[in-house]
């Protein structure tokens, strides 16, 4: 189909009657795809089985699959949240969960392994997001758990018993923290930088008794200014 086209016809049966929609065409480029195209975590469907999973990359030009990290090399622990900087594999971060876990930051051909948790963090470095400059990477620190419902209408509830947000300076190896992002009575989570890097977005919820009050938890979408030159946050959320 290289350089050709595909015509798609769509029909639907609604209230016992068939309807035909307008055909549309997919044009196939004559130019080959670049060598690499997509990375992903591959895990069996289910809620609790993670003994065999890995982070993989697929060559979209021929559909070949290659392993980046396989958890057989990490004593079967869970691998998650692999995040390149704007799809650039030269800057790459991922997290290994568990008692022997760590967070790996790759840049300039070197890898830095960070302790997964300590007293200053209060939880594991879980959900990352790169600053567009590549100088910083924002993380949430989460104490994540899951519970199963006994009713038929719901199956599983994944929840945090604590979570904060901070920024890591990958050049100086320093943490940028602020009490506005680590409240004792609030849970901050999933930080994201704006495209210009001047704002960091995140979600925040009031602390509740989990899992008993899981229905009461409501997250707000918040933002705070960020100065990449000084590595400081604004004074207002």
What are these regions (language model features)?
Residues 78-80, 124-126, 161, 187-189, ...:
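Beta-rich catalytic cores
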Residues 36-115:
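Conserved, compact domain cores that house catalytic/ligand-binding motifs in diverse enzymes
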Residues 36-50, 139-161, 203-218:
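Short, conserved, GDST-rich strand-edge loop motifs in beta-rich repeat architectures
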Residues 1-29:
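Beta-strand-enriched, solvent-exposed domains that form extended recognition/catalytic surfaces
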Residues 61-77, 106-124, 167-187, 225-237:
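Multi-bladed beta-propeller domains
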Residues 91-92, 134-137, 200:
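Hydrophobic beta-strand positions that form the internal "hydrophobic ladder"
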Residues 86-88, 132-133, 195-196:
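Residue-level detector of Asp-centered blade-edge/turn motifs that repeat once per structural unit
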Residues 83-85, 129, 192:
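Conserved beta-strand position repeated across blades of beta-propeller domains
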């Amino acid at each position: 189909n290289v350089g050709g086209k595909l015509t798609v016809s769509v029909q639907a049966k609604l209230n016992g009657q068939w309807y035909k929609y307008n055909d549309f065409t997919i044009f196939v480029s004559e130019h080959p795809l670049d060598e690499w195209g997509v990375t992903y975590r591959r895990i069996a469907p289910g809620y609790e089985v993670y003994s065999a999973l890995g982070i993989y990359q697929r060559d979209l030009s021929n559909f070949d699959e290659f392993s980046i990290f396989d958890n057989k090399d990490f004593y079967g622990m869970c691998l998650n949240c692999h995040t390149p900087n704007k799809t650039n594999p030269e800057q790459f971060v991922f997290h290994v969960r568990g008692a022997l876990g760590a967070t790996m930051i790759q840049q300039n051909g070197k890898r830095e392994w960070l302790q997964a948790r300590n007293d200053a963090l209060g939880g594991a470095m879980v959900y990352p997001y790169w600053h567009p400059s590549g100088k910083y990477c924002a993380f949430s620190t989460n104490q994540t758990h899951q519970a199963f419902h006994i009713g038929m209408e719901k199956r599983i509830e994944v929840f945090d018993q604590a979570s904060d947000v901070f920024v890591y300076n990958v050049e100086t190896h320093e943490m940028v923290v602020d009490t506005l992002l680590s409240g004792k009575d609030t849970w901050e989570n999933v930080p994201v930088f704006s495209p210009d890097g001047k704002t960091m977005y995140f979600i925040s919820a009031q602390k509740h008794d989990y899992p008993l009050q899981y229905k009461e938890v409501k997250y707000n979408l918040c933002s705070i200014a960020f100065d990449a030159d000084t590595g400081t946050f604004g004074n207002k959320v």
